[in-house]
Amino acid sequence: GKSSVAANIAYRMAKRNIKVGVIDADIYGSSIPTIFETTNARPHFDENKNILPIEKDGIEIISTEFFTEPGQPVLWRGGMLNSMISHFFYDVKWHDDTQYIIVDFPPGTGDVTLDIKSIIPQAEMIIVTTPHPSASHVAIKAGHAAKTLGHNILGVIENMAYFINPVNGEKEKI
């Protein structure tokens, strides 16, 4: 849900000629490369050893998934997580005209959230949830964490609530 929303926002911005990048900060559950159909891509490095993000449809993308073997888990904690997140912000050579970076967070309010707060204290957030009570509960906690950390919340998106049945035009809950 969150990754699909992040990707859709990035695609919409790119369609409006806004230069955008996506950081897949969901280190343990990366899905951005799958959504963008870039799972086999491998970043290159420039002469200064900066990481060159993968580009798809005018959107720059970086993910841990690009640095691991297919199907292999990422078994990191603490310092290693912080190091990778820092690399994504400081060592990726985004295009000079990149206007926005969308960060796809992991679920919850753990290390990655705190690391990103220290890197970009002025970050603005969109909370993504589903109608399921447990997802809503986590979203509320994420909202409280964002406020505690001083992040501005732009809004809340409730994903996967319902769709309009194309056959009968009725609202169908998911």
Protein language model regions, located:
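Conserved catalytic-core segment of NTP-binding enzymes
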Residues: 99-100, 106-174
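Phosphate-binding loop that captures ATP/GTP phosphates
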Residues: 13-71, 89
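Residue-level signature of catalytic and energy-coupling elements of molecular machines
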Residues: 3, 24, 32, 62, ...
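Switch II (G3) loop of P-loop NTPases
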Residues: 43-45, 64-115
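Short acidic, glycine/serine/threonine-rich loops at helix termini
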Residues: 5, 33-37, 73-74, 114, ...
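Conserved, well-folded catalytic cores of nucleic-acid-processing
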Residues: 16, 34-39, 65, 87-95, ...
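Walker A/P-loop phosphate-binding motif and the immediately C-terminal alpha-helix
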Residues: 1-24, 143
